[in-house]
């Protein structure tokens, strides 16, 4: 399988949850390599926006995007953002579609915080993930939260 290149043995020996964790780890490494190369080629002129920051505060990011590419926000843009429930009060307040539910999405629990929702998802994953894969997931989460978005702890 092409997306398991250079980690085929881990892929074959892993369960589905571990495969996803290892895939995310490997795609993150590859993305970081390409990002470094692009930054050196383009003098650091790369705009990276986390999904979480965007759905919680889209106006700031839409202004940055439009000024970067020399365009403006249109009514069509605003319509699509409304269809996607952007802005949101919580990241996990996505649009309620059957396809998302089939893939495991659930609306946030009443009175939960962002951290509560992340902890719930981690507990679900931990039931099936191997010990080593869970360590990788926790490392990835920590790195992501340090670099892009940290909802804090209760």
PLM-predicted stretches and their roles:
Residues 1-48, 54-154:
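PAPS-dependent sulfotransferases, especially Golgi type II membrane carbohydrate sulfotransferases
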């Amino acid at each position: 399988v092409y997306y398991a290149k250079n980690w085929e043995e881990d892929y074959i020996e892993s369960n589905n949850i571990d495969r996803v964790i290892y895939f995310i780890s490997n795609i993150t490494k590859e993305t970081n390599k390409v990002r470094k190369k692009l930054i050196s080629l383009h003098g650091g002129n790369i705009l990276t926006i986390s999904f979480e920051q965007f759905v919680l505060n889209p106006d700031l990011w839409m202004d940055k995007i439009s000024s970067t590419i020399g365009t403006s926000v249109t009514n069509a843009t605003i319509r699509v953002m409304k269809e996607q429930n952007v802005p949101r009060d919580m990241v996990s307040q996505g649009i309620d579609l059957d396809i998302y539910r089939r893939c495991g999405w659930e609306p946030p629990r009443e009175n939960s915080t962002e951290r509560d929702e992340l902890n719930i998802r981690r507990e679900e994953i931990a039931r099936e993930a191997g010990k080593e894969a869970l360590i990788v997931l926790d490392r990835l989460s920590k790195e992501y939260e340090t670099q892009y978005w940290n909802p804090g702890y209760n």
